[in-house]
Curated annotation (Swiss-Prot):
Signal peptide: none annotated. Its main location: cytoplasm. Residues 703-727 are annotated as: Disordered. The gene is edg-1. It comes from Caenorhabditis elegans. It is found in: Cytoplasmic granule. It comes from the Eukaryota. Pfam families: TPR_Edg1. Plays a role in regulating deps-1 cluster formation in the germline. This is Protein edg-1. May interact with deps-1 and prg-1. The lineage of its organism: Eukaryota, Metazoa, Ecdysozoa, Nematoda, Chromadorea. Disruption phenotype: RNAi-mediated knockdown results in enlarged deps-1-containing clusters.
Amino acid sequence: MVENKSSYELPDQKTLDMNKEWVQELEDIFYSYKKYDVNKVRVQQFLDRRSDFLVYDFYTSNLSMDAMQYFQAGVTQKDVGLSKDYILLMRKLYSMLTEPSKQFFQEQFVKEWQYHEIDYTPYFETLVPRFREKIARLLDEIVKNPEEVDDDVQEELRWHLLFSPVTTLLDIFTRCLKNFEITGFCLNVCLKVPQLFFDRPLKIYHTEYETDRVESLMALVFRRLIFNKRWVDTSDEEWSNLEQLARVICSGQEPSLMSAWPLLEVVLCELYTQNRTPMISVEVLSEIAVKIVENFDNLKYATSARTKPAENVLLTPSIICFLLNIIVDENVSNTVIENCKMILKAIGQNMEQPFDAEAKSYLTSKVLKEFPWTLEFAISTWFKALEVEKRRIPSAVYKAINAEMKETFDERTFDIEESETVDQSINEEDEERCSTLSSESSVKTAISIDHKSDTAVDNLEMNQLHLSPKPKASVEAVKSCKPAFVAVIFEEIPPETDQNISVFEDPTIEVLTEYLDCIITMGVFDISCADELMRHSSVTFESSEQLEKVMKTAFEENFEIANAGPQRIKEISGKILEVFGSTSSESDHDRIASSIIELIPTEEYEKTGPRWSHDIKKSEIIQPLVIPVEATLESWPPAEYRYVAPGIKESRDSARHERLLRQQLATTKSLEMAQLHRDLWAENEKNMEHWTRPASPCNSSFFAESSVKPTTSSAYGNSSNFSRYAD
């Protein structure tokens, strides 16, 4: 390959002559394409001719402009073979340019490609025989030894990337997921075509699974890569490499091929779309979002629930809502839940401006109240932008708060009206189970339900009735109807004797257990929020033995602990012992924590579920939480004048019909008169002499002595005009 270096100095005469001849011939061929009069033999001879020199930079600008100016004619020849030859001519020209000239060529080619409203690159690929196979062979060569790749292979891959960016880049990234060691080399090739990257908006063809809009090449390819990997069985290693690829793309050399904002937008939109198969794809996407939100502090956050997606900011209210919905989804993994919590926490810490009044009211009054208290408390704590004056907590925790701190908290109650609303949403099947649950439950269990903490009801709901947890108050709804629930099943137990048969001998233990149950539930969701509640608590334990007993009972009865692993259980128990067991030694803390971990079953379940899916929904764009209703102008006439009496309506219809007939008659007469005028005008010979093309003069010389008089039209004068020259 000829050394590709810029040379603005005038080359030697021999090279300059070769340049002139070569450039002139290529210009003639390009011009023949413009006239659709191409000599196929000449084109083939030009392509077969070997040229071992670089085109002088002085000629390349005009030559590149000609190639783009005639490009549309070149790829639309009647003979498809000639169109394919035009692409080969452009490829030959591109290979003989210096690096600065290649950059100019690339810029002009992208302009020509983007000039049209429709993306024609899928058609371009048909003009290159075995286009995808060539890309695959090039990538195979790169995989053999990524450190030592021939320059010809690199330049060929670069040309394919310029010629068809989406297909080539998608194939490159797909291979990078399988052979991650070639990522560095492939990204260097991308850097050689900067006209396609660095968040430049491009008009690109979108499939039916994508929202058609102008966006960057990297954003579209990354989204399509996720789609393709969900469509087929993809290994965990490839999904892990996808996360690494996103990190390399955004955190590489400056400026990076893709900034953090468009990548985060793609990832959040994919989480927003109801595509949850395979689950590992959701885990990877949420992990990417966590890394971006935590490490990039220059992101913009919407403070209004009406902010539109086009404003290039994160729609924070909408993001809060759909991430909370993912967290309470029973089908998502713990990894996804933890990542969503980290995203929300990072966004809350990064937001500097408070939400506007409408967004605050909507989120606190309508959204957060629909979720369990742990989510409401955590969001109110993380998002200072909500400016929540009093964070709501359950009664068991609220009663234990220090008197001086109670002004910053509020008791979360469950109204009867809300309970009735929730009851309507409960399954009839579940209601049947509630009403017909019978002798399989022991009397001891039933008695403890009526007199223990609300936790026992929670356990019964989850373990014995097999009810699905509901976002709003599946637990609280059952708590609200607990006395009636127990009375239906155990009618033989007199209410006045309930206090004597409680499973707890000491009512203080019952209160403490209920309190720790709430703290554990909060700790499973967020350990820092649980620690804050304990620090503001007035609860005390008489001894370390009492604390250990209450902790074991609370951990054993808490159904949320099933979502926590051994490490989280150790953290929660450690925090409880740190706050309430300060008199105990560290060895006692370790012993108690170890005994609790042994008490809680922590079986590790294998990841199951489909590895791929063809039931993939169209990728959606995050929408505003509140979509304003645009005011429409009232139709005319006003409503009070729209009534028309029956007789008037027929009269108006008749008049309208008559007007249409007269209009048609007038139009017909006008056309006839215009045609008659044109015919009469054309019959006039005088008009025809001035408006028609004159006859060509004869070829005889003006000074020739000939008896034959030249025949000319009056437009060139009669023969007498030339007689004076003949004399």
